[in-house]
């Protein structure tokens, strides 16, 4: 009897260990937006604690049409939204034009830490060209921190990707962001690693300037760092960035310009919205053939009413080295976390969807 009790105890411990180690996986029905909503709601409830075990929401290829719903929230921590493919898994909403706004339109609103998105498209289908002077339609509003996006496409026009946390940290790898005006905007530190940036037409006929980024860096040291990104341009001329307010920071390193003639001569917009204190820099810009087309000097005088702030925006190789990922996020190392989660996501895909 004693041996039986010991055996039962061992079995219970083993079962408990297996139960603890088992991945938390929520499957979404293909193309079913309501199924996606319920999956996110379930994950939010069970991962309310910041130390919660990571949960993976598996989203098969299909269109998940949220209709006019806005600000679908992620409030649970350590939640992964894993699509089947970047081009095939599409989460879309279409806010009415009268709801236009940076706080009132997002497809997904993240309020948690440790959120991971991979292999999907977020599309905000607000009718930008019918919206008048402003057509703000956010795809991913990040009020949380330590978000990682891997192979995520964001389709919109104005304010497409909004980092809405002054202390937020974000890392994007091999992702694609489309837009026209300030379509990468906000606060905190965000590192764009070999991403594709697509500037769309500012107006239907292509007239009017395009601005990629509008940082409002306040309480962090780095702002927006673009490393090894490619910029594709659709007809309208564009600037890298303009200052929003506070102390904007932005740097483009090792950038490939597919249509360099569409970049304004100033490269950065000198007209600040609410500040002239812009730390905007550039290093080793190339054309589509890999030729270095960086000017030797580019002094931009940032201006706001009677204030002026001249800045040499071209930096040296030694200055560029300070923007290494390990320096920017020394206690996070998101590239290592991404590699680990991506491997797990691929394993789960094979289990649930078969060989790819």
Where are the regions a protein language model picked out?
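Bacterial N-terminal signal peptides
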Residues: 8-15
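Sec/Tat signal peptide C-region and signal peptidase I cleavage site
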Residues: 17-21
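Bacterial N-terminal signal peptides that target proteins for export
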Residues: 1-7
């Amino acid at each position: 009897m004693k041996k039986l009790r010991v055996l039962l105890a061992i079995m219970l411990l083993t079962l408990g260990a297996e139960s603890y180690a088992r991945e938390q996986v929520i499957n979404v029905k293909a193309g079913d937006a309501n199924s996606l909503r319920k999956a996110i709601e379930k994950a939010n409830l069970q991962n309310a604690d910041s130390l919660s075990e990571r949960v993976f929401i598996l989203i098969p290829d299909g269109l998940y049409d949220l209709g006019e719903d806005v600000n679908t929230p992620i409030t649970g921590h350590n939640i992964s939204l894993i699509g089947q493919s970047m081009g095939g898994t599409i989460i879309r909403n279409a806010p009415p034009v009268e709801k236009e706004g940076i706080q009132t339109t997002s497809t997904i609103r993240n309020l948690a830490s440790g959120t991971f998105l991979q292999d999907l498209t977020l599309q905000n289908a607000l009718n930008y060209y019918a919206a008048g002077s402003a057509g703000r339609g956010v795809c991913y509003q990040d009020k949380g921190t330590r978000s990682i996006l891997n192979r995520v496409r964001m389709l919109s026009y104005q304010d497409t990707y909004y980092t809405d946390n002054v202390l937020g940290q974000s890392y994007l790898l091999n992702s694609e962001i489309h837009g026209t005006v300030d379509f990468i905007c906000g606060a905190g530190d965000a590192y764009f690693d070999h991403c594709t940036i697509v500037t769309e037409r500012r107006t239907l006929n292509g007239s009017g300037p395009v601005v990629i980024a509008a940082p409002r860096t306040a309480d962090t040291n780095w702002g927006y760092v673009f490393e090894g990104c490619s910029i594709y341009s659709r007809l309208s001329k564009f600037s890298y960035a303009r200052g929003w307010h506070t102390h904007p920071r932005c740097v483009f390193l090792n950038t490939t310009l597919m249509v360099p003639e569409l970049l304004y001569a100033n490269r950065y917009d000198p007209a600040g919205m609410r500040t002239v204190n812009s730390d905007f820099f550039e290093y080793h810009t190339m054309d589509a053939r890999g030729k270095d087309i960086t000017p030797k000097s580019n002094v931009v005088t940032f201006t706001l009413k009677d204030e002026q702030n001249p800045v040499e925006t071209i930096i040296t190789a030694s200055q560029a080295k300070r923007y290494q990922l390990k320096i920017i996020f020394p206690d996070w190392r998101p590239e290592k976390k991404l590699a680990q989660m991506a491997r797990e996501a691929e394993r789960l895909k094979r289990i649930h969807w078969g060989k790819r």
